[in-house]
């Protein structure tokens, strides 16, 4: 999970990243813990639809702090403890987990928007962008911030090939091409100048 300022094709400034577990991983681990099946994101979203999002007291890691980054390891651990306690149903726990994630995403994104000089739109993409509750919350944030909200169709949110292909098409149109002599890179930071952060988020 990253917040990026897009300055042009291939030109990004990283505003925030995940210092431990990615949000998608937190969804997958929650689904596995509750036996909801795979893929975890849609399974959690379906179960959460029938639960009370305010029923289980779960943490909002880093929310309200000056640190702009994300952290979901503590939330994941709290879900485990809550489930092991036997006090809550799967529906209430998934709904509360999803709401905690939403609160963190909205809080961190608001900080990023406020840190930018003149943002022109709020764009959300990737697998978690297929979650309707998350999309709605970020769309509300965009409206509050006076920004257009942009998101791909749901069926494209989890299609990595489409994302890579579109990025390649944009680079080709901008004349940003490479020959086949460059070596493979297992990790390719979107912002090579971004500072490393504490925790495991150095993957960038």
What is each model feature region?
Residues 152-190:
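Glycine-rich phosphate-binding/hydrolytic loop that grips phosphoryl groups
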Residues 127-128, 154:
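Active-site metal-binding loops of divalent metal-dependent hydrolases
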Residues 21, 96-99, 155-160:
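Short, conserved micro-motifs enriched in small and acidic residues
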Residues 1-88, 170, 174-186:
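A short helix-loop
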Residues 121-122, 139-164:
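Conserved phosphate-binding/catalytic loops in two-lobed NTP-binding clefts
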Residues 46-122, 131-145, 192-204:
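A contiguous, well-structured pocket-lining segment that forms one wall/lid of small-molecule binding clefts
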Residues 3-6, 133-135, 161:
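Short glycine-/acidic-enriched loop or helix-start segments at secondary-structure transitions
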């Amino acid at each position: 999970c990253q917040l990026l300022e897009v300055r042009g094709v291939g030109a990004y400034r990283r505003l925030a990243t995940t210092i431990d577990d990615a949000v998608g991983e937190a969804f997958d681990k929650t689904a596995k813990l509750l036996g909801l099946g795979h893929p975890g994101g849609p399974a959690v979203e379906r179960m959460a639809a029938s639960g009370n999002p305010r029923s289980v007291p779960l943490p909002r890691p880093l929310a309200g702090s000056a640190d702009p980054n994300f952290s979901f390891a503590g939330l994941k651990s709290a879900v485990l403890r809550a489930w092991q306690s036997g006090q809550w149903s799967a529906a209430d726990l998934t709904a509360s987990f999803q709401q905690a994630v939403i609160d963190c995403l909205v809080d961190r994104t608001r900080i990023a928007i406020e840190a930018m000089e003149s943002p022109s739109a709020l764009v959300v993409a990737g697998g978690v962008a297929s979650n309707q509750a998350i999309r709605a919350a970020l769309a509300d944030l965009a409206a509050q911030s006076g920004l257009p909200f942009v998101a791909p169709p749901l069926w494209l949110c989890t299609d990595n090939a489409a994302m890579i292909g579109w990025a390649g098409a944009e680079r080709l149109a901008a004349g940003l091409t490479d020959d086949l002599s460059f070596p493979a890179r297992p990790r390719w930071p979107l912002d090579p100048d971004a500072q490393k952060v504490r925790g495991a988020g150095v993957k960038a």
